[in-house]
Amino acid sequence: MSSKQVPDTLTFECETGNYHTFCPISCVAWLYQKIEDSFFLVVGTKTCGYFLQNALGVMIFAEPRYAMAELEEGDISAQLNDYEELKRLCVQIKKDRNPSVIVWIGTCTTEIIKMDLEGMAPRLEAEIDIPIVVARANGLDYAFTQGEDTVLAAMANRCPEWIQNAQNNNDQDQAIQGLMSFFPLKNTKLSSEPTLLSNHPPLVLFGSLPSNVASQITLELKRQNIHVSGWLPAQRYSELPSVGEGVYVCGVNPFLSRTATTLMRRRKCKLIGAPFPIGPDGTRAWIEKICSVFGIEPQGLEEREAQVWKGLQDYLDLVRGKSVFFMGDNLLEVSLARFLIRCGMIVYEIGIPYMDKRYQAAELALLQQTCEQMGTPMPRIVEKPDNYNQVQRMRELQPDLAITGMAHANPLEARGISTKWSVEFTFAQIHGFTNARDILELVTRPLRRNLSLEDLGWSALVKRDKINLV
């Protein structure tokens, strides 16, 4: 395809206004594991229960820390008292599991029948003496990963208030330690680390990452003498970070715009608008932005990024010059597209269910900068794309790879287009310097499979002549 068929500038379009994504209640899959003392109660129909059982793949005897409050005809027709039914379930949860927090997840059905979960939660919380957080993760209003966004936004309101005096006391302790350094005492161990890492306002990072990935990112910032005061969500509900006026917050995922808004408007935090730490280029830009806000000169980031790119050379040789088409599912599309363009790929289109241009402004700027740096045409960004139109565009463009939701994968494969499920990028470890290889492992898997089939001479049997797309 010639570059004339691809826009030369970053263009934004909006098509149908419909969401074609995985259900947002799937956020329970990773959040119940992240918040170790939590219990998630999904209030919905049997359909929601079937989805969770199939998507999460957890057997009932494993006693996972989530459950379904199944709505029946009596609930929907208002013959049963919603409050009493939820109270019965929560009392049973407290007796069996005794969690530190219960998270109610609202679904499409609770929205349609106007169930007042927010009104019932404070009353029940006072009765059973367990915090109850209400999050609306319904598929009518939200896309796949925005389920996590609604949960974190609700938890942001439960974070303790940051007190300026605590920081002042910390500064006094450091001053005392500095004074005592002139009068060394025997058998006294004074660590200089807190002094080095606290010459800036408190920093809270928000976004659910596996513990090892969060530790890696915290360590990368520590190397720049930046101390992370806390993560939202924390591993335990009782360890939620203190937020408030004077606290800086920064997101690690592009789908957390609601959480960012809550932290800024309701908790008066200052948001650091940065690209997201996906890929070595994004991670470097993310750290550099935080350093610039705190007036810190970054050290060794250029060498660190170059070292990572060098380790990816075998994958880069495979993807260079290949084309990719994002149909849109998990709101990670812009960050992944930017990274793949930096790897030498051509991105024809970035479909995305929802785009908050303010929250993703730095990421969009880095995307445009990357396209100019690599000399590739800038992709068109289509918000709420119409799948029929997308299939027609793919028929014309014939990309080497389509990153799509599971519903479209098999039909596209049957028509000769290699696919990769977008949901795999959601559950994979893709953040930070060290996990860039995992992204390329996922992207190149269908490409390597095709090469293997050709080498074996089986392509004629497995992949017949391409059928015209309908």
From Swiss-Prot:
Family: Belongs to the BchN/ChlN family.
Pathways per UniProt: Porphyrin-containing compound metabolism; chlorophyll biosynthesis (light-independent)
Catalytic activity: chlorophyllide a + oxidized 2[4Fe-4S]-[ferredoxin] + 2 ADP + 2 phosphate = protochlorophyllide a + reduced 2[4Fe-4S]-[ferredoxin] + 2 ATP + 2 H2O
Top-level EC class: oxidoreductase
Function: Component of the dark-operative protochlorophyllide reductase (DPOR) that uses Mg-ATP and reduced ferredoxin to reduce ring D of protochlorophyllide (Pchlide) to form chlorophyllide a (Chlide). This reaction is light-independent. The NB-protein (ChlN-ChlB) is the catalytic component of the complex.
Subcellular compartments: Plastid, Chloroplast
Keyword Membrane: no
Keywords: 4Fe-4S, ATP-binding, Chlorophyll biosynthesis, Chloroplast, Iron, Iron-sulfur, Metal-binding, Nucleotide-binding, Oxidoreductase, Photosynthesis, Plastid
GO cellular component, as recorded: chloroplast
Cofactor: binding comment: Binds 1 [4Fe-4S] cluster per heterodimer. The cluster is bound at the heterodimer interface by residues from both subunits.
InterPro entries cross-referenced by the UniProt entry: LIPOR_BchN/ChlN (IPR050293), Nase/OxRdtase_comp1 (IPR000510), Protochl_reductN (IPR005970)
GO molecular function ontology, one term from the record: ATP binding
Cofactor or coenzyme needed: [4Fe-4S] cluster
GO biological process: light-independent chlorophyll biosynthetic process; photosynthesis, dark reaction
Protein name according to UniProt: Light-independent protochlorophyllide reductase subunit N
EC number: 1.3.7.7
Metal-binding recorded as keyword: yes
Gene field: chlN
NCBIfam families associated with the record: DPOR_bchN, PRK02842.1
Pfam families, alphabetized: Oxidored_nitro
Oligomer status and interactors: Protochlorophyllide reductase is composed of three subunits; ChlL, ChlN and ChlB. Forms a heterotetramer of two ChlB and two ChlN subunits.
Binding annotation for [4Fe-4S] cluster: 23, 48, 108
